[in-house]
Amino acid sequence: MLGAARRQLGSGPMLGQVLRRLRPATAAAADAARAYSAAAKEMTVREALNSALDEEMSADPSVFLMGEEVGEYQGAYKISKGLLDKYGPERVLDTPITEAGFTGIAVGAAYQGLRPVVEFMTFNFSMQAIDHIINSAAKSNYMSAGQISVPIVFRGPNGAAAGVGAQHSQCYAAWYAHVPGLKVLVPYSAEDARGLLKAAIRDPDPVVFLENELLYGESFPISAEVLDSSFALPIGKAKIEREGKDVTITAYSKMVGYALQAADILSKEGISAEVINLRSIRPLDRATINASVRKTNRLVTIEESFPQHGIGAEICMSVVEESFEYLDAPVERIAGADVPMPYAANLERMAVPQVDDIVRAAKRACYRAVPMAATA
């Protein structure tokens, strides 16, 4: 996975020539979300991300991609397949293995009106570049009284994969959602990936785009509306994936799939679960969450990341502040184990929320008996 980058982005005159030849373009207006119609075909998350990048690069010459192995190798996960051949090495830039270096270059390019898309081979490596992300990209618009926009996307796989150890498995949703000036998106389906990435590239502010390695190869139904090149999803708006009346379940990224599986199991036991795909962590769609809780009177939050100071805690606080009198049961919060991710497969599974955990939590919220053996 960590093979040497095929090309190195130089400094000085070479970089200057590259940046000068990329012409800024007027940003496309944000498109309203389109209603989901009958599925026209299926698309993998990988294909959805690739097509979104391709179309946005075609529509706007100021958009360019940079990162380790994004060019000749076509990306560690093949998200940038075909883009080097189509757009050339000035817009698909292979970099050295120096996240701090190429992230700083990208932020500087965004200052000058370009629209960089920075790929991290894993978001764990974004820690090498966090000064540029937090202190440069996130704060510059505020510190310049709105005179400097930083239209940049930081994207790559986030969270647990399969047997890659503690230093390659962390979920950074809560980390980046804590920072004013950043927007944080967490796609689940192919529709999410395509619509949210397009919105992120068009946005005038820095966006952290957290993908999931285990979802890249998964296929989802996708409609003709979503395949339209003008399609984009609104940032800050959640999606109700499944309507229900007994309990609200919030989730993001891969956990949405687990929540839907749990809802199927619960329905066979007479519990109607409403599943909310958050899509956006910052801004968080508090209105949709609270409206659902006011209908179901119960809440279960799911996240893959550590429990303390997490997304679930923020959602719980929002419901306590806005809908406390509607709750008929204590909120149930499900999160990853409060330990670094183990390498052993059996321990790794125990450290990440599973479908059974969601089912048990929903039953507790609905005051349905849970066998003692199941809670052990």
Swiss-Prot record:
GO terms for molecular function: metal ion binding; pyruvate dehydrogenase (acetyl-transferring) activity. InterPro entries: PDHB_mito-type, THDP-binding, Transketo_C/PFOR_II, Transketolase-like_Pyr-bd, Transketolase_C. It catalyses: N(6)-[(R)-lipoyl]-L-lysyl-[protein] + pyruvate + H(+) = N(6)-[(R)-S(8)-acetyldihydrolipoyl]-L-lysyl-[protein] + CO2. SUPFAM superfamilies: Thiamin diphosphate-binding fold (THDP-binding) (SSF52518), TK C-terminal domain-like (SSF52922). Signal peptide: none annotated. Thiamine diphosphate binds at residue 99. It comes from the Eukaryota. Residues 1-36 form a transit peptide. Coiled coil: none annotated. Its EC number is 1.2.4.1. It is found in: Mitochondrion matrix. The keyword Protein transport does not apply. One of its GO terms (biological process) is pyruvate decarboxylation to acetyl-CoA. It is an enzyme of class 1 (oxidoreductase). K(+) binds at residues 152, 200-201, 203. The pyruvate dehydrogenase complex catalyzes the overall conversion of pyruvate to acetyl-CoA and CO(2). It contains multiple copies of three enzymatic components: pyruvate dehydrogenase (E1), dihydrolipoamide acetyltransferase (E2) and lipoamide dehydrogenase (E3). Tetramer of 2 alpha and 2 beta subunits. This is Pyruvate dehydrogenase E1 component subunit beta-2, mitochondrial.
